[in-house]
């Protein structure tokens, strides 16, 4: 026997492959307050036991690899390894299980969503032993939450900046989303803001294209904001999309927005990436800019029920990375969103402390301590007839974003904005008087339409418009 072989034997090293569950499945483990906890929906390949599948997820997303390695002896696996500590079947689904995994906090860089996701939702999602894998929820411990700055300003500071209280905020995405010149784009913004909206918005794919370069758009939109403010006496804003091909260009656009004196910029946080988003969030905090977040690409990640990552995880990640608004489903309208599940992650965005509630898809109690909240944004196929339901379901701390529901008004953009503002004010007034928006909503809108020809015209145009499809995102 060679000296080298003797050395291997003397330290207990045994080459080869062993089952993951022998090391990473630990049902006796008691979770710590400092652990990051994850709930994975696991669909094992035929013949793979759920314990082995859950342990494989824990291993491949923390310290494990496919074979025993020498260097395991140079560190403390008990201190650093992820542990699958509980597995339960998914009711009503064949061969699907929820695997709960605990990760020691020292596995993750402080203040880095990028690093957290690189481990937890990294290569493990391509693992051959699994047919499918979905991250349903994360519990972020207080010790890790406190390493993030979170939203640049938060809900209360935004209301103070805008001097708008006691109602949802109103917005509009300018359409057509692509093809307008900067001057015509600015004109549409002005008409909507003058009509009564609080915000107008760049569409997520408006960056700096040949038909409208970013600097021209910023200038004309700033002119629209100042003109509308002078005429209405209200503070107005336009979400100027600072998303760019590199971080330096993104920050340059945000700097120009600040120099123009506008209140808010925008970022596509999934296509732009978490590192870029956190950098922009820090700039916005330091320079008094609000930050609107669009979730373009989210459905690629979260739409499939058995693979990918649920949006509640992306919402938590955004709150940590930083953003003052984020699009988060409507329940009504044309885009995906089941009511209880949507309200679950809306609470995760807005509230300080959220209790575990499996009926709403919340797998863990989450304490955000002092981190500011994020305003959820409702958009996609909504119009004046949806106003009572939106006001009732989401309350005051939300942004209601009507694109086609403003610009599609038969009389033009400003009357479309007037119709939405009148409908909102009528719903808030009725709610404050104790009326039931769920049962009396249509009547409230009809009463308001008697005094607003703009609202009456909008009601007539969209009276038959419905988007009736079953939600894909169910428990």
From Swiss-Prot:
Entry keyword annotation includes Translocase: no
Record's cofactor remark: Binds 1 Mg(2+) ion per subunit.
N6,N6,N6-trimethyllysine PTM positions: 14
Residues making up the propeptide: 1-2
One example GO MF annotation: magnesium ion binding
Catalytic-site annotation from UniProt: 175, 294
Compartments, as annotated in UniProt: Plastid, Chloroplast
Binding positions for Mg(2+) per the UniProt entry: 201, 203-204
Other facts noted in the record for this chain: The basic functional RuBisCO is composed of a large chain homodimer in a 'head-to-tail' conformation. In form I RuBisCO this homodimer is arranged in a barrel-like tetramer with the small subunits forming a tetrameric 'cap' on each end of the 'barrel'.
HAMAP family: RuBisCO_L_type1
Protein name: Ribulose bisphosphate carboxylase large chain
Organism (species): Bouvardia ternifolia (Firecrackerbush)
Encoding gene, per UniProt annotation: rbcL
């Amino acid at each position: 026997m060679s000296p080298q072989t003797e050395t291997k034997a003397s330290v207990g090293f045994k080459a080869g492959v062993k089952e993951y569950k022998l090391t990473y499945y630990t049902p006796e483990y008691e979770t710590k307050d400092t652990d990051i906890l994850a709930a994975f929906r696991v669909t094992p390949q035929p013949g793979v036991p759920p314990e082995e599948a859950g342990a494989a997820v824990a291993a491949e997303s923390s310290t494990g690899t496919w074979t025993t390695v020498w260097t395991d002896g140079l560190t403390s696996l008990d201190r650093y390894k992820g542990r699958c500590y509980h597995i339960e079947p998914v009711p009503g689904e064949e061969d699907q299980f929820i695997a709960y995994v605990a990760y020691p906090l020292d596995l993750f860089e402080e203040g880095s969503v990028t690093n957290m996701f690189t481990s937890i939702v990294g290569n493990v999602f391509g693992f051959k032993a699994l047919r499918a894998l979905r991250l349903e929820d994360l519990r972020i411990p207080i010790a890790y939450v406190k390493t993030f700055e979170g939203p640049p300003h938060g809900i209360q500071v935004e209301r103070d900046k805008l001097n708008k209280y006691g109602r949802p905020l109103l917005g509009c995405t300018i359409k057509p989303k692509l093809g307008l010149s900067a001057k015509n784009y600015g004109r549409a913004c002005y008409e909507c803001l003058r009509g009564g909206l609080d915000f107008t918005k760049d569409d997520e794919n408006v960056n700096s294209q040949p038909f409208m370069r970013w600097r021209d758009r910023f200038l004309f939109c700033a002119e629209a904001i100042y003109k509308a403010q002078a005429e209405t006496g209200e503070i107005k804003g336009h979400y100027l999309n600072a998303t760019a091909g590199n971080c330096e260009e993104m920050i340059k656009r945000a700097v120009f927005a600040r120099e123009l004196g506008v209140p808010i910029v925008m970022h596509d946080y999934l296509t732009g990436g978490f590192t870029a988003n956190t950098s922009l969030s820090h700039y916005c905090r330091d320079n008094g800019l609000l930050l609107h977040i669009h979730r373009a690409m989210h459905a690629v990640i979260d739409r499939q029920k058995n693979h990918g990552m649920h949006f509640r995880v992306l919402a938590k990640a955004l709150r940590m990375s930083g953003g003052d608004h984020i699009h988060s489903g409507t329940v009504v309208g044309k885009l995906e969103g089941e009511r209880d599940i949507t309200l679950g992650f809306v609470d995760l965005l807005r509230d300080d402390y959220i209790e575990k509630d499996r009926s709403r898809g919340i797998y863990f109690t989450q304490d955000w301590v002092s981190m500011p909240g994020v305003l959820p944004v409702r958009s996609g196929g909504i119009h004046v007839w949806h106003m009572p339901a939106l006001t009732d379901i989401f309350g005051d701390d939300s942004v209601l974003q009507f694109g086609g529901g403003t610009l599609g008004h038969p009389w033009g953009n400003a009357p479309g904005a007037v119709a939405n503002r009148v409908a909102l004010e009528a719903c808030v007034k009725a709610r404050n008087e104790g009326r039931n928006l769920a049962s009396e909503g249509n009547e409230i809108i009809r009463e308001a339409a008697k005094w607003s020809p703009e609202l009456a015209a909008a009601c007539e145009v969209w009276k038959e418009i419905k988007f009736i499809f079953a939600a894909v995102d169910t428990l």
